Amino acid sequence: LLDESNYSEKREQTDLADAGWPSNGYALFSISCYSGGNRHGVFHPFMESNCLVVRKETIFSIGGADERFDMPGGGALNLYIYRKLASRSETVVFVLAGEGSFHQQHGGVTTSPVEAREAKLIRQRDQLNSFLEAPFKSPCIDPILLGKIPGSAMNYLKFSCESGLNRLQRFQEQGRDPYEDEKNKTPLKNGGF
């Protein structure tokens, strides 16, 4: 993972310039890392997703984008929507394991190294938990992997496999299902898919 104490927007701009990504987008893997929210790779539960492809009816069936999320940047709305959608029986989570979602430093609410960042995250967590009426938990569901894995992404897949196997072993030793939420999914309201 990224050592945030040694990272800045200036360093990021230098890394991007050196990576040569305009001629090969996959070169971004050479300067990337897993995000803090999904730091264990693709075989661990995700907190959120930066790309959701769903029908309008499906979004409506979970109440849409809840406008009570009134904190800067939308607060934890992304986590809320992902949790609600992933918990539905008709929802299938696909992961493009050879692709990435690259988030740059830009002064955003939760990614900026500011003194009050931790306090903001606590307020967002508290608001999310109150709307869910329970502590937030990443949905533990089986991901379906799609797509090719370019050579530049192989180390990420290797890390994901190793981390996923460690998780699987830990759950087996505890007699638990690593994808326990899969069997507890709830039907969508109003049809949806």
What do the PLM-derived regions correspond to, one by one?
Residues 47-49, 53-55, 60, 66, ...:
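A conserved catalytic-core signature of glycosyltransferases
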Residues 1-52, 60:
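Conserved catalytic core of nucleotide-sugar-dependent glycosyltransferases
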Residues 68-181:
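C-terminal catalytic/acceptor-binding lobe
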Residues 42, 57, 93, 184-185:
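Exposed boundary/loop context
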Residues 14, 163-166, 186:
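Intrinsic-disorder/low-complexity peptide segments enriched for small residues
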Residues 185-193:
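Positively charged N-terminal leader segments that act as targeting/secretion signals
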